[in-house]
Amino acid sequence: MRKLLNHRNSFISFLMLIAVVLDLFPVTLVVNAKSSSSNPPAETRYRLDAGRSTFMVRAFSGGLLWFKGHDHFIAVRDFSGEVRLAPETIIPASLQLTIKSNSLVETRDIFTEQQKQIINKELREIVLESEKYPEISFKSTSVTGKLNPGGQFDARIEGDLTMHGVTRRIDIPAQVTMAGNDLRARGEFTVDRSDFRVKATSAFHGLVRVRDKLKFTFDIVAHRY
């Protein structure tokens, strides 16, 4: 009986010791538990590098005499922007992009230099009206996707594209990879030029004209800063 009482007294003493410890350090325990679950993922910022990137617009020949015309391969020469993302999980992420509308130029060798100058002049003055609308911009509203086993991230970027004074919501699929301090995004998407009130150039009295669908392709490099 005495041994049983001794065990009970020892157990009660142990419980009292735990109670004293908890009473002495309640704030420390609560703060540590909260901080481990509420810290947001670190954000990494990348600046787009136009010099190391490729950004193209393809305008297709259309009209009754479409076979008399040529597709146009237009390069975007001057653009800037920023990507923000969580380095381990990619998401949450955001993209902001600004293009100088007077930097779009014809690149196809099928055209002579004189023809390219005429096309570029029409792009600036008739199609994009660069003096009135000097910038084309895109700002993401949401980024979703999944990380593949090889480290490539398949992303779907939804956002607002503003061109020729008109803003429309578009989706951009992209394959994103990261190596060291560099980020690379590749993909393509289409827009309807009529949605942005962009005029089409034509020839042969309108029997050859640029189609409504414009195809954008990109291979963009960005650097962490």
Regions found by a protein language model. Give the residues of each.
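Generic intrinsically disordered, low-complexity segments enriched for polar/acidic and small residues
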Residues: 8-11, 22, 43, 135
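Short, aromatic- and cysteine-enriched interfacial helices/patches
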Residues: 1-5, 24-25, 203
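Low-complexity, acidic/polar, glycine-enriched regions of mature
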Residues: 26-225
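Bacterial N-terminal signal peptides
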Residues: 13-26
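Intrinsic-disorder/low-complexity regions
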Residues: 5-8, 22, 31, 38
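Bacterial N-terminal signal peptides that target proteins for export
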Residues: 2-16
